[in-house]
Structures are given as structure tokens and as C-alpha cells.
Amino acid sequence: MTTALHEERLAAVLAAVAETGARNVLDLGCGAGDLVLRLAERPDIERITGIEIDAARLRLAEARLKDLPEAACARVQLACASLTQAHPVLAGYDCACLVEVIEHLPPADINRLERAVFATMRPAHVIVTTPNAEYNPVLGVPAHRMRHPGHQFEWDRPRFARWAGGVAARTGYAVACRDICGAHPDLGGASQMALFSRSGR
């Protein structure tokens, strides 16, 4: 079961995927398959690959796929692998999604993730979402805590924009950041999204 906030986040990601016109999509850090299942329900998406390092969560995703029609399942592949290691076999996708993933990585792994995704896989588009730390008071999160015990960090919007801009400049992508999951006039949304598009496609 997903929360209303997570459903809103997934809807924003699906809308962004539609913006790109992607026909094949990578879900990097797919977890139990929340996004994969929703992508599989869309006939315009021809191929979906989910990557997850947690074998138990991947098994759950596999089990959930069995509830889909056979034609939808046939368009999905799942694999257990690290997101911070380069996988040339995953090159050539139209779009890669990292939904609330980067905040679970130790800071030292962020650069490895950048190299793996933006230098090796180099999808035409990359969609990244992460919590907006500025919004935490609205959710009742104390100032000295993060939203989830597994989070290594939570960035405010300026920090996220700096990271996204740096990645784009280093790897030949353009990027646009936006608020998602709410629009507080001062604090933005509960989550934030960066949509990267490879330059010179």
C-alpha cells in the first residue's frame, strides 16, 4: 500500500515520462515495483527495466507483476544490481527514473551514481526526485530529524538545484527543476524533481 503523498509523487513522475515521449524506461532503484507496475499499465511504454539492489524488495516486485495481464508483464524486466556501478548493457534508454533514491545513498556514492547513469548509461532523459527538506515542518518532521531513518541526507531546493546543475554541466545535459507534491508559497512541494535532457540528441 502506498501513501497519498507517494501516489502524488508517482503521478508527477508518470507525467514527466509522458512529457519526454519515452517508449522505453529504466526505473533505477525500483524497490517493490510501484513505478514499474504503473508504467506497465501504459501501452505506449514498450519496454520497462527495473533495477534494485535489495533482493527481497525485488522479489516482491516480481510477485506483484504476476497480477498484471500477460502482455504487460512481457514488457518488464527486473534485475538485482547496484546503481553506483556502470552497466553498459543499460545504455540506450529513452528515460531513466530515480524516484526518492539519491537520499538513501552515502554522499560518497553520489559521484559514482552520476558516472554510472550520466556517463555510462546516458539515457536521453533522466528524472530524479528527492524530498524537499524545506517542507519538513509542514509534515511535522522535527528540525533535528529526517523523514526516514534510511535517509543519508535531505536537501533544500537551492542545494538540489546546485547538484542538478553541476551534473548537467559536467555530463552534457540540460536540466530543469520543479516542485512536486504540493506548492507551499514559501516552502515549495514535499518533493522536488529534476528533469535532465541530453544535449545534442
Name what the model sees in each region.
Residues 3-6, 12, 34-35, 53-98, ...:
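S-adenosyl-L-methionine-dependent methyltransferase catalytic module, highlighting the catalytic core
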Residues 22-31:
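Conserved class I S-adenosyl-L-methionine
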Residues 23, 46, 124:
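Short acidic/polar active-site loop segments enriched in Thr and Asp
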Residues 32-44:
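Conserved SAM-binding loop of SAM-dependent methyltransferases across substrates and taxa
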Residues 47-52:
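Conserved SAM-binding motif I beta-strand of class I
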